[in-house]
């Protein structure tokens, strides 16, 4: 593999970008109380909404670094544009224009990413100054406009830098840059997770429990890979057409339908949605019994539930299921795909006449 110069350069470039990303994840935002950040790290609060946000940021949120927002604003921006493509004809036409249209959509995605980063960084700054999501530990002393502005601009610039890194990896590295950054973020948390599990189990003489956890982790990885690689292939046959003296078409191909075509995107989007109730709860006044009750309920069941509240588990699960269904529908439109196949003279073998293909493909996708 390393004997191929171009492949070697791409691998080394990707690893170098990973190093830059991990370096930025350890640089704290100016204006943050580092002692409070250390207390938060020592407390080990890694569950609930805070734990999910910290996971996808690669631990950058735990240290309140310049990359604390991670790649989540970009993912949210991409999903928003894909949703708008369904309802705005102009965006749909741009998507069908090929490379030139994709460049315009990519540019709009960048603009929306910066706007979302400004909004999310402002919300996180406000929440962390009030001690929400952090067990009452305030990370930002002296909550002044100048300090808040500095923190917000720094975190927004960090998100823009991560977006640029992802695009560089896509162009000069291996694979999709944004997906690899998410992968690097999650992988970076494994040593600390295994270290904590070892201290709790093997460090207290329960080596069997630690071995069982490692075995279950490996089996889960194997199972995830198995499901991720699973696909249903729908055979497509193209009819022969005569143009002059040439016979066109007649070849066979297939449409690969993945079992999990949405990937981890619905989980990220659901986590972003869960962030807003915590922000609203922080803004509610406590001098009123009704608003104080609502705020306490959100804190117990969502913001600081540590992932054990039944409502948190149910609500997050429903959000993931909804966004998975919705995102899959947007990613692959069976009706449009069927029309394209029909216009090109293709059909599903065993399904005649050709006009029935537009009914067959959506039915298979629903199953």
Where are these regions (language model features)?
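N-terminal cationic and glycine-rich segments that engage phosphates or anionic surfaces
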Residues: 1-93, 100-356
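Conserved small/polar residues in nucleotide/adenosyl-binding loops
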Residues: 357-363
